[in-house]
Amino acid sequence: MALVVFLTGVPGVGKSTVVGLVAEKMKLDSLTVGGMTSGDLRSGSARVGFEIRNLMTNEVGVLAHVNQATGPKIGKYRVNGEDLDKVGAEAISSAVKDADLIVIDEVGPMELTSARFKDAVQAALGCGKPVLGTVH
């Protein structure tokens, strides 16, 4: 059975930083790292949304934004389901097939609005490969 590790904690504690450092170390050890990360979108010092990045292709999409017109509302943000599926869920699905380590940063209320994302996470957890992620 493969190792599955999810980090949790309050916002800003360093979950994503730890995952990023481990992923970089694995790349230095010649492992293929795939999956997705998320990060802040800022306008000046104000957070206006979140981006989502495919670690294998470096494709970036908008996970959620204050100016997103449609989609599920989580706090002051609306989730961009199209980018969540196209970038996030696809990144995880590709990692299940092609990576040595699957990164899922993060699983939270925004990501869980997508059935395709949830299916991709389930596939990752059941594929027998190591998974490293964060939980909101």
Task: Write out the residue ranges for each language-model feature.
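N-terminal phosphate/diphosphate-binding loop that engages ATP/GTP or pyrophosphate donors
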Residues: A23-V79
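Conserved lysine of the Walker
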Residues: K15
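Hydrophobic anchor at the beta1->P-loop junction of P-loop NTPases
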Residues: L7
